[in-house]
Amino acid sequence: MKSVLCLLLGLAAIAAKFINLYIFFLVNGVGDLKQRQLLIFKLLNNILEPLVDKDIIDIGTNFDIRNNVELYTKQEVVKGFLNRLKVGMLPRGEVFTLQIDRQLKEVVNIFHMLYFAKDFDTFIKTACWMRLNLNEGMFVYALTVAVRHREDCKGIILPPPYEIYPYYFVRADVIQKAYLIKMKRGLLDEKLCDLYGIRVTEKGTYIIDENVFDKRVALNDEDRLRYFTEDIGLNTYYYYFHIDYPFWMNDNIINNKVKTRRWEITLYIYQQILARYNLERISNRMGDIVGLDLNKTIKKGYWPWLVLHNGVQLPVRLNNKIITTDKNVQIVKLIKVYENIITEAIIKGFVEINGLRLDLHKPEDIEVLGKLIYGVVDKHTTTLSKTSVEAYRYLLLLLKAVIGLNPVESDKYFVVPTVLDSYQTALRDPVFYQIQKRLCNLLILFKKRLPCYTREELIFPGVKIDNVVVDKLVTYFDDHLMDMTNAVILNNDELKKTKSDMTILVRKRRLNHQRFKVVVDVTSDKTVDCVVRMFLGPKEDGLGRLIDINKNRHNFVEIDSFLYKLVTGKNTIVRDSIDMHNIVRDRLMTRDLVKKVETITDFKDFLVKDLRNYITGFPARLLLPKGRTGGLKMMLYVIVTPLKLVDGVDLSMLDVTRKDLLVDFRSTVLLDKMPLGFPLDREIDVGTFFTPNMKFVDCVIFHKQQVCDMKTRWNRWVLKQYDLVDQTFIGDNFNINNYNVDVDITRDLNRDVLENIKLGKID
């Protein structure tokens, strides 16, 4: 009897533990976004470490997928997943990449398991089990996509990818210094700290400089743009864009919110990234993006200086790399065949794939073009047992294959990926922009086949832009602290305490700009809804020559677009740079975000006010190109057009203060029927283009140049030790200030950073 009683008490204790856990996270949290948010944070914390959270361990170890097949809406997905487990999936600790077909199929299967969980309870149980048993990279990727596409995960904020896995965003020398601090428990020689750029705050937080003036891996003048291509905000933007619009996801699965004009926005995002990159090239007096010629060498190499968690270094591509070799000559031929097929289809106005005819002659057929280049063409099948990557998406895969990782002629499962093979790092490599320019030419050809916009399509009867005034535009470089604590392992004591004793931050130099406003005076003879679009583009090329509008229109970046209600008479529209469409300020460190989430009472209000565009947003820092010290001449193009609302739209979508979090600020402009990039997306007939409801105005971007302590320290410790100063010739720049970045700011740690440390905002 006593033993039975003890058994019952033991079972009761175990049951109570789970009951309390489920009450906290699941039962009471069915409508509690705050508790769901905290649980996702736990799942993605210290992803490379063994699980230390007992609640997640208990859920994961006590959940048996085999005995709960009925908890998923697509049971064939579960059966397929269990079969893969028997065969064996990518082990923990290995590098994950979407470019390997087998790894792609595995991670898509993992996503389907999470996506087709019947309820949030099953979703969390499945995620906890996966966190314990599956490859870390696959788990993070699948969970991230699932959170963005499940209806019951709306409003959940994900930790930025550079905190989850810092290895893709922090240089290898900084990682090495972080391990040095960890191994020596912070007991470093003061001179060594000064040489390495390591500081310690009063609260014991370690700050390591990522010195942009250390140019040992510079191979050519393209390295002057590293401040832009390696910006953590820009690479996060591109990664989350892929998460919202994965190339492998069927239309019948993808979230309805982002399904509308899915492939048009994909093409437009790539075109805009190219345009934004080109503005930085002009700022640095570099020429246009050189097209990728498969019959020639890649003149510009790239040294990533990145090392992964398992010690694998991302490969270097040296200058003058030969593209076509005996090993890949067949792939190069296949690329040309695919390009010819798409080109001929655009010219003919249609293409046939497996008996399916697809038109390519109407404006709305841009969806077909996007599928041909970046997506999947299927016959609206609902089967999920097979990941479909046929049609011409192989064009992009093949282009990457001849330059980076080659999965086409190799059956390797364990690989060394290049920077091109990960969405977190692809923008770093200059050849990425050459590849995308080659693909973007197909979009330009498609748009060229469409007629120019008529005056009737451009004009807004009764509406006139009287004046546009732009504040002085000034850019500069400042300090940004990024939490890289997850890059170093926990010791046994820390594992027991479930957190690291050290906080390690990396100080990065990032482009920024002074806050500015754009004021537009509009006269209207009626009260009417309208769409206001603002584009920023160059006036001159890198040599100071005026650019023809038809050649230049592809270089204009859409910095703002919004809906507005005009009233009869004069309207003064004031747009602040911090309020422009779909931009995001610097993301909070996850450790600070967790503290806020735990203490606030109205989580949804916090999301709307403080975390707007947190996932979808383009970095506010990069709204303007760097410009030049003496000023870079630019043009701001503003156009006001009538709102042609898409049929069946809920008008409450226009209210950006809504707390139901169903507003996707990346695509609110899609409420208007006009094409993305209108009216600069098509060939311009200068005889009919200019109308009263549009205006071009000149503006100048100035770059503020000051002294950086990273540079002075480099000069003090490195250059003075040698009789010969490094005389590497980089393009037409002999001044070190023009190499890499014209970094500014004070000789000491940024005053704002010090102030935050004093106030206790940074531990």
Predicted regions mapped to residue ranges:
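Intrinsically disordered, flexible peripheral segments
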Residues: K17-D763
